[in-house]
């Protein structure tokens, strides 16, 4: 890309390398380039760096954060003046006991080295001024107002500026004398209402948050005692304006004392050169009228003495009022200081009371929480004990039921064994009866004596020791007569427990266990089960 030489009053024109491209594409590329080339004075950290200044930069973006660059970086945060001041104040928070000592070195091109050049002509140029002042040092920030015929410039050091002022002031240029004096420094402020414990270092650090500070001093009297005032010189006018704004709108404290500093613009007083004779307008009538009489003393009782005395009385009255106002101001300051200390003590006391109340509330809360935990632990222990007791009772009940079930099963088994033995005995008895009564059945005629064979059997008693010594009597006598022969109706009553078993001989046949003697079928017995119950 071809770049021409820079013009004196503006940047050089830049040749556009996209001129040979189609118009829509060229417009899009220019738009993207303008978006990526925006630079901001108070920009945040954005994406890729911007190496060139965009001539068509929109002024509305000066206080905005930087956008993301070609690398698609995130947009930087909005950093305005409040954010910068608060960030610097955070670094100063805390004790300021051991501040480093300031190095008193003269700053090059400071605001104190700025000269005012007046009574110029409209054809003056910057090259001419630089050529005129270059023998006295380096020149910077030359500004010319051709309409009002004055200019400003900075010389590197104060001594060089004073030498240039002394040599060039009153020099003739195009039949007009040049007027040179030190320009009023708009970057300097006066700080008042300072405590006796504010030093040059603390003043420098305190006002450095508003901008770069070149010089900060505390004004002292002839005994070296601080007067409660100081002077701060900034490198830029924006720093001084920022300090004036913040200290006027807010209360800015430099120490622990609740005594805010008061910031005012600094009125420059020239105590070096003063007002020379060449600065007077000698052609005016007032000048000639005032210079008709020279220095003299007035005679007592004269007209001059009378009015001279009145002027002195008025000045004395001013001085008295000024001193009275100063004393009153001092008394009010002491009174306010005492009130401030008392209010500060009360505030600290109330803060301690509030902390004590909070501690008591925390103690009560912790005590309540501890009591709640203890109560919950007791309730949990009681519930566990009750649950354990219920479990033990349930276990004992289950054990008792198991024992009862076991005893019941043992009784059932014993009864079943007894019933089985009784059944076996009855079966054996039936078999014996069937074997011994066969002949009696055949020999019976009509005389009801056919059962004689059965009488031979007689009456038998079976004693069972295993069934609790039960006596079982079985009568084998045939009461049927001739028609029945050897068949008998035998009514047997089976006893379980401690009952007796017997035969009924009269009445109709019983249905307890009626079975023919010659019937050996044992499949239809209904007294006990044949198979043993399993447990």
UniProtKB/Swiss-Prot annotation:
Gly residues composition bias: residue spans: 65-74, 434-459
A GO molecular-function annotation: RNA binding
Protein keywords: Cytoplasm, Cytoskeleton, Nucleus, Repeat, RNA-binding
Keyword NADP: no
GO biological process: mRNA export from nucleus
Biased composition (Low complexity): 27-42, 50-64, 486-502
Spans annotated as Disordered: 1-80, 346-411, 429-535
Xref: InterPro entries: NOPS, Nucleotide-bd_a/b_plait_sf, RBD_domain_sf, RRM_dom
Listed SMART domains: RRM
Gene3D superfamilies: 3.30.70.330, 6.10.250.1170
Domain of life the protein comes from: Eukaryota
Protein name: Hrp65 protein
Pfam family membership, one: RRM_1
GO CC annotations on file: cytoplasm; cytoskeleton; nucleus
Gene expressing this chain: HRP65
